[in-house]
Curated annotation (Swiss-Prot):
Gene name linked to the record: proB
Protein name: Glutamate 5-kinase
Binding site for ATP: K10, T169, D170, T211, G212, G213, M214, S215, T216, K217
Function: Catalyzes the transfer of a phosphate group to glutamate to form L-glutamate 5-phosphate.
Gene3D superfamilies per record: Acetylglutamate kinase-like, PUA domain
Taxonomic placement: Bacteria, Pseudomonadati, Pseudomonadota, Gammaproteobacteria, Enterobacterales
Superkingdom field: Bacteria
Principal location: cytoplasm
GO annotations of cellular component type: cytosol
Keywords: Amino-acid biosynthesis, ATP-binding, Cytoplasm, Kinase, Nucleotide-binding, Proline biosynthesis, Transferase
Pathways involved: Amino-acid biosynthesis; L-proline biosynthesis; L-glutamate 5-semialdehyde from L-glutamate: step 1/2
Length: 367
């Protein structure tokens, strides 16, 4: 083994259930064994786990429930305690304690809460405790959900200061096409940069059960790689896959980390789930992408969602493509009022101003 490294392992529903309605405990035992072996060798392990709803449904005897958010949250509330109990029981076989962290998007959007979550996670790791992270599905609404555990795992990797992020799924990795419908599909072993062509390939692929398909795994890889974290998509069923990844053995698809990673604040901006969205005109798009300029109110065409000053927002071009993320200098209502106006008009329109730009270039990351 090499010197101590920090690894985040994301386990999707398809991996934990094997495609069935219930948790595949035998397989989870094997995954824990692999993690415990690495832990004993001095590595730091973080688990991002799905499966709370599946565990809740199993524990309640597969009840007939209406297909509502409330039903899913009921199952998550029951299942989350069962899930963490399972992780605790299995890791305790190896004398390892686990610590549960349940997160929502609000913990990522707010810089102070983000830093608090980081400090908690790193304190667990510093004390040889394995953090087990999941989205707080029992209380999360659509407005406060990260949305899927792929993107949550990328945020966890940033919080942990991880060296590697391993996304385990029911596929061997990212293919040139969906291997289940195209026999000519080939495994892509190495990726050195994520572009629109690769996003198009991922958009046509499906990774099985759960909320995250290949497109969300690509989003997670993009966030992690730009933060300097190697990311691997691999099959959770492959024997010894977790140890192989830590040994540097080629498995699945390896997304190579960016050579010059983003500094810490910009990692937060890039990784935080956007609280809202603004659409900008062609001139603003060119200024942002080609000249690295700040976004002026004049270039804003529309504002979507409700957000506060200081929150991270998504910036899209007229075709709806996500071109940048940035910290808004104004709340959503104020941006709607000053959209399309020159900067010198801000004070007259609002009665105050926080500067001449809507999003400053120092607080912006292009996609």
């Amino acid at each position: 083994m090499s010197d101590s490294q920090t690894l985040v392992v994301k386990l999707g529903t398809s991996v934990l259930t094997g495609g069935s309605r219930r948790l595949n405990r035998a397989h989870i035992v094997e995954l824990v064994r692999q993690c415990a072996q690495l832990h004993a060798a001095g590595h730091r392990i973080v688990i991002v786990t799905s499966g709370a709803i599946a565990a809740g449904r199993e524990h309640l005897g597969y009840p007939e429930l209406p297909a509502t958010i409330a039903s899913k949250q009921l199952l998550a509330a029951v299942g989350q305690s069962r899930l963490i109990q399972l992780w605790e029981q299995l890791f305790s076989i190896y004398g390892i304690h686990v610590g549960q962290m349940l997160l929502t998007r609000a913990d990522m959007e707010d810089r102070e809460r983000f830093l608090n979550a980081r400090d908690t996670l790193r304190a667990l790791l510093d004390n040889n405790i394995v953090p087990v992270i999941n989205e707080n599905d029992a209380v999360a609404t659509a407005e406060i959900k990260v949305g899927d555990n792929d993107n949550l795992s990328a945020l966890a990797a940033i919080l942990a200061g991880a060296d590697k992020l391993l996304l385990l799924t029911d596929q061997k990795g990212l293919y040139t096409a969906d291997p289940r419908s195209n026999p000519q599909a080939e495994l892509i072993k190495d990726v050195y940069g994520i572009d629109d062509a690769l996003r198009a390939i991922a958009g046509d692929s499906v990774s099985g059960l759960g909320t995250g398909g290949m497109s969300t795994k690509l989003q997670a890889a993009d966030v992690a790689c730009r933060a300097g974290i190697d990311t691997i998509i691999a099959a959770g069923s492959k024997p010894g896959v977790i140890g192989d990844v830590m040994e540097g053995i080629s498995v699945g698809t390896l997304f190579h980390a960016q050579a010059t990673p983003l500094e810490n604040r910009k990692r937060w901006i890039f990784g935080a789930p956007p609280a809202g969205e603004i659409t900008v005109d062609e001139g603003a798009t060119a200024a942002i992408l080609e000249r690295g300029s700040s976004l002026l109110p004049k270039g804003i065409k529309s504002v979507t969602g409700n957000f506060s000053r200081g929150e991270v927002i998504r910036i899209c071009n007229l075709e709806g493509r996500d071109i940048a993320h940035g910290v808004s200098r104004y709340n959503s209502d104020a941006l709607r009022r000053i959209a399309g106006h020159h900067s010198q008009e801000i004070d007259a329109i609002l009665g105050y101003e926080y500067g001449s730009v809507a999003v400053h270039r120092d607080d912006m990351i292009t996609r």
